[in-house]
Amino acid sequence: MSRTYKATGIILKGMPIGEADRLVTILSPEWGLIRAVVPGARKSKSRLRGRSELFVINDLLIAKGRSLDKITQADTLESYPKLSQELGKLASGQYLAELVLCLAVSEQPQGELYELLKEHLRRLEDISSGQSLHSHLAQAVFHLLAIAGIGPQVHRCCLTQETLAANFSDPRWRVGFSFEGGGLINLSPQNPPQTPVPRINQELGAIELCLLQHLGYSFLPQPRQILPPESLNDFLGVAWVRLELLLRNYAQYHLGRSFRSAELVDTLSGLEF
C-alpha cells in the first residue's frame, strides 16, 4: 500500500509545531479535512513557507504518518491576497473558515463544501469599501449551513408548516425565530400551533424576513427588487447586521461552539450587542 497520496486543498488553520514546522488543517474536495505537518515551513527560506499560509490552495503530495501526515510537496494553484489587505475581510474569511471546520468531516469527499467556501471567499475579496460585510456573511453562513443539512426553515412555520410571508402593511407585524425549533415560528394569534411553542430567540420584522427568505438564492438579493420603496431606508444596514448575528447564533447553538473571528468582525464594525 502506498504511503503517500495526492490532494488538492485550501489551508483553513495553521499553528506552530516543533522548532520550525507548521501544523495545518486543510479542506480537500477529495479527502475532507486533513491535518498535516509542513516541515520547516517557519524557516525564512523554506519553499513551503508561503504555501502553508491561510487560504492558499495547493496541489499536495502528502506522506502518511503514524499520528500526523506530512506534506512533502505543495504547488500553489490559487490564493486570496485581497483578504489579507483589509482586516475586516480577513476576519470575515477566518469566521467562515471556523464554521467550515465545524461542518466538514475527515476521510470523506467534501467537494460541494469546498467549492462553496471558495466562492464566498472570492466574494469577500471583491467587496468594495462601501458594501456591507454583514450581508455577504449572512448569505455565506446560510449557504454553508444549508449544504451541511442544518439550515433553518425560513419559508414555513416550523410548527404548523404554514407558509409565511412578510407583512409590510403593519409596522408592528413580527414573526418568531427559534434555534430549538429550527427556524420560523408564526406568532399570529389567528393560527395558533397545536404543539408547545419552543423558545423564541428573536423576532423579525417584514424587512428582515424578506431578506432572510432570499438568502437561499445564488446571489445576494437586491433590496430595490424585493422591498417596497418605503422600506429602503437606514434600517436596511441594521437588518443585515441583525440577520448575520441571528444566523451566527443559530449556527453556534447547533454546532456547540462559538466563532472568535466573528467577534473581531463586530469589533471592527464598531458594533455592541
Swiss-Prot record:
Keyword DNA repair part of the UniProt annotation: yes
One GO term (biological process): double-strand break repair
Keyword Protease included in the entry's annotation: no
Residues spanning the membrane: none
InterPro entries: ARFGAP/RecO, DNA_rep/recomb_RecO_N, NA-bd_OB-fold, RecO, RecO_C
Keywords carried by this UniProt record: DNA damage, DNA recombination, DNA repair
Pfam families from the UniProt entry: RecO_C, RecO_N
SUPFAM superfamilies: ArfGap/RecO-like zinc finger (SSF57863), Nucleic acid-binding proteins (SSF50249)
GO CC terms in record: bacterial nucleoid
UniProt record similarity statement: Belongs to the RecO family.
Function: Involved in DNA repair and RecF pathway recombination.
Listed PANTHER family: DNA REPAIR PROTEIN RECO
HAMAP family: RecO
Protein name: DNA repair protein RecO
Organism of origin: Rippkaea orientalis (strain PCC 8801 / RF-1) (Cyanothece sp. (strain PCC 8801))
Organism lineage: Bacteria, Bacillati, Cyanobacteriota, Cyanophyceae, Oscillatoriophycideae
